[in-house]
């Protein structure tokens, strides 16, 4: 396994873009991101444990209940949470994107991050979606920038690894610098891979990994409403699909863990007001004496 460039566009068949659509007042700040797979991918996700859940999360959870997705759209600057028409706006966002991309609305992950309780106007999103499509390319950096809120740096990484002698790639982007507390918190993480793995095993891998990565970091003790970690696997690497535990699954887990640990550390290092990052390594004794 080795670290490579490309972020979420490192894996075959994935493109990304990021634009300023007008949600944020600063015109130099991108505020709308898109990640797109040329074919429908298997998908897995984990979500915030906050009892109050943002409208985009509710919509996404419903969309990928079948373990499938083809695109991710995320806006920054407004969380679309605690709004009377929040679900309607999130669904409208996916409908507009689906129409432009020629895919199913149900195959779209919708995410938002930003101010809670402020109405989200669909107009800037509607005007920004065509630009997102036009800008699709190897632009993981644009997407990483567009999902930032109080972050000071974009966060992206990619790795290459082998499954059964076939080269596979995996990449991820993340946002988060405040309201970071165990059991998710204000974090959005989007991971892509061209490795062929069933949606069931993908979910198993993600759920297992999260317990030892994102659910272990804390910055300020606050848990947010919108946040999720999502993985899309389109299988374009051409390896034999991972459908059970074994050596191939273990190699996939190693790659996933490399991505998540790196992103976790970048989030912690970028914490609001953070000057020092602490890592604690515990070694349990092999034998206990009474």
Language model: regions and residue ranges:
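Short, well-ordered amphipathic alpha-helical segments that serve as non-catalytic structural scaffolds
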Residues: 52-63, 88-100, 203-216, 255-264
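Conserved small/polar residues in nucleotide/adenosyl-binding loops
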Residues: 280-286
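Active-site-flanking structural segment that lines cofactor/substrate pockets
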Residues: 35-67
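Glycine- and Gly-Pro-enriched alpha-helical subdomains that act as flexible
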Residues: 215-218, 236-268
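N-terminal amphipathic/basic leader segments beginning at the initiator methionine
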Residues: 1-47
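Glycine-rich, mobile lid/loop segments that gate access to catalytic sites or pores
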Residues: 100-214, 224
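Channel- or pocket-lining gating/hinge segments that regulate access to a cavity or pore
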Residues: 193, 233-236
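Glycine- and acidic-rich phosphate- and metal-coordinating loops
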Residues: 70-77, 107-113, 227-233, 273-279
């Amino acid at each position: 396994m080795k670290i490579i460039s490309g972020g979420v566009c490192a894996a075959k068949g994935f493109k990304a873009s990021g634009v300023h659509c007008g949600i944020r007042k600063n015109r130099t700040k991108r505020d709308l991101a898109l990640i797109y797979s040329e074919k429908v991918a298997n998908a897995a996700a984990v979500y915030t444990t906050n009892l109050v859940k943002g409208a985009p999360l509710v919509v996404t959870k419903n969309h990928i209940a079948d373990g499938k997705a083809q695109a991710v759209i995320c806006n920054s600057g407004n969380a679309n949470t605690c709004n009377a028409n929040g679900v309607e706006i999130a669904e409208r966002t996916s409908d507009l994107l689906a129409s432009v991309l020629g895919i199913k609305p149900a195959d779209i992950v919708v995410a938002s991050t930003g101010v809670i309780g402020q109405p989200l106007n669909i107009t800037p999103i509607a005007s920004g979606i065509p630009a997102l499509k036009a800008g699709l390319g190897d632009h993981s950096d644009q997407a990483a920038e567009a999902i930032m809120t109080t972050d000071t740096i974009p966060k992206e990484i990619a790795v290459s690894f082998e499954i059964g002698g076939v080269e596979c790639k995996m990449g991820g982007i993340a946002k988060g610098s405040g309201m970071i507390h165990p059991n998710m918190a204000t974090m959005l993480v989007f991971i892509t891979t061209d490795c062929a793995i069933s949606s069931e095993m993908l979910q198993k891998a993600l759920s297992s990994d999260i317990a030892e990565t994102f659910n272990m970091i804390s910055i300020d003790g606050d848990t947010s409403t919108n946040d999720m970690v999502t993985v899309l696997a389109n299988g374009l690497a051409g390896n034999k699909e991972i459908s059970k535990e074994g050596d191939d699954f273990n190699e996939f887990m190693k790659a996933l863990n490399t991505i998540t640990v790196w992103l976790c550390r970048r989030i912690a290092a970028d914490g609001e007001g953070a000057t020092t990052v602490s890592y604690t390594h515990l070694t349990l004794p092999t034998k206990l004496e009474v």
